Every structure is written in structure tokens, then in C-alpha cells.
Amino acid sequence: MGITRDSRHKRSATGAKRAQYRKKRKFELGRQPSNTRIGPKRIHEVRVRGGNKKFRALRLDSGNFSWGSEGVSKKTRIIQVAYHPSNNELVRTNTLTKSAIVQIDAAPFRVWYETHYGILMGSKGKKATSTPNPKSKHVQRKHSARLGDSKVDSALETQFAAGRLYAVVSSRPGQSGRCDGYILEGEELHFYLRRMAPKK
């Protein structure tokens, strides 16, 4: 029996079984879920209705994640699935789907922050000393002009210190073959932190 997306096989609102008056149709077909896991990239191309293509990601290990408040996107490694609003089984099996909360590598964003603002992350305005060559006056002026915008949420700063950031997957890995999303910040971050906190 193929997977179908029709509703004729469902009981009616009053609980009556519906009579079968036609067979399944091609335009009602469904396919098995991709259950995208974390691992070396493996993507299958699927030919779909109209001759179009879908990209079924079976394994992914990285994606493009954006840092909304800073307006920057970086390709970074996906470490693990931390929470899923619909199913704990998807967390246990590290399955990547849309709206999964994942932990990503913070390094690309930390490097960008420290070069953009010229200060160390979480150092309360301390200058970055990692570069041996002195900065030009022009670059110093740029950095000092940007310093006012360099405030980072304390919860986010804690994650940067640990080297892992919480992010939401906003693409559909089983449809587009990509695992892209955005870093959790502000109210949304605090909401999910409360959900992930161990129950008393």
C-alpha cells in the first residue's frame, strides 16, 4: 500500500466509515520522511510532479545561520539537536527538521564579531589583542564608531563562552536539501531555554 494524502480513508465526523468509490490517485501520493541526520553530506534528488526536483537531505553537517540583530550570516557546523517542539524522539535521534532547535558552532560568529568591533567577545570593551600588527587610524575610527552597537544579550554571551549557540532551523532539509536557520535571541531564546530546562 502506497502512502496517500487523501481524506477518503478517514471516518466522517459522526464516526461512519466512508464507502470506497475510487482508487488512490497519483496526485495524492506521499513519500517516506527523509529523517535527516547529522553526518557527512548526503543528498538524494527526487523527481516530483511537473518534472520538478526536490532535494532529499539524508545527512547534513552544516548550514547557513543568520544572526538577526547583527545582520550577518555565516556557514557553520551543526553540533546536535537540543529540542524539538513536536517530538522528543527527534531529539534523541538527532533528526533535523524545520523548527528544530539545534546547537551550532559559535566560532565563525565570534571571529566576525571580534574583527567587526575590534573587541573580544564578553570582555566589556577590552581591545582584541590576538592580532600582532597594529590597526590603522582608519580602522580604529571605524571600530570606535561601531562600539555603541556592540552590546550582546547576556544569555547569548554565555553561549559564546561555551562555544555553542542555540539556533532554529527555518529551512526544510527533506525538501530543499539545506539546513539553514537563525540564532535564537531575546524573548524567543528565553522561551526555549525555559522549555529545555530540566523539570523539577
From Swiss-Prot:
It is found in: Cytoplasm. GO terms for biological process: cytoplasmic translational elongation; maturation of SSU-rRNA from tricistronic rRNA transcript (SSU-rRNA, 5.8S rRNA, LSU-rRNA). The keyword NAD does not apply. Residues 135-145 have a biased composition (Basic residues). Gene3D superfamilies: 3.10.290.70, Ribosomal protein S8e, subdomain. Keywords: Cytoplasm, Ribonucleoprotein, Ribosomal protein. GO terms for molecular function: structural constituent of ribosome. GO terms for cellular component: cytosol; cytosolic small ribosomal subunit. CDD domains: Ribosomal_S8e_like. Its main location: cytoplasm. The keyword Aminoacyl-tRNA synthetase does not apply. Residues 1-40, 123-145 are annotated as: Disordered. It holds the Pfam family Ribosomal_S8e. Belongs to the eukaryotic ribosomal protein eS8 family. There are 2 genes for eS8 in S.pombe. Component of the ribosome, a large ribonucleoprotein complex responsible for the synthesis of proteins in the cell. The small ribosomal subunit (SSU) binds messenger RNAs (mRNAs) and translates the encoded message by selecting cognate aminoacyl-transfer RNA (tRNA) molecules. The large subunit (LSU) contains the ribosomal catalytic site termed the peptidyl transferase center (PTC), which catalyzes the formation of peptide bonds, thereby polymerizing the amino acids delivered by tRNAs into a polypeptide chain. NCBIfam families: eS8. Component of the small ribosomal subunit (SSU). Mature yeast ribosomes consist of a small (40S) and a large (60S) subunit. The 40S small subunit contains 1 molecule of ribosomal RNA (18S rRNA) and at least 33 different proteins. The large 60S subunit contains 3 rRNA molecules (25S, 5.8S and 5S rRNA) and at least 46 different proteins. This is Small ribosomal subunit protein eS8A. It comes from Schizosaccharomyces pombe (strain 972 / ATCC 24843) (Fission yeast). The gene is rps801.
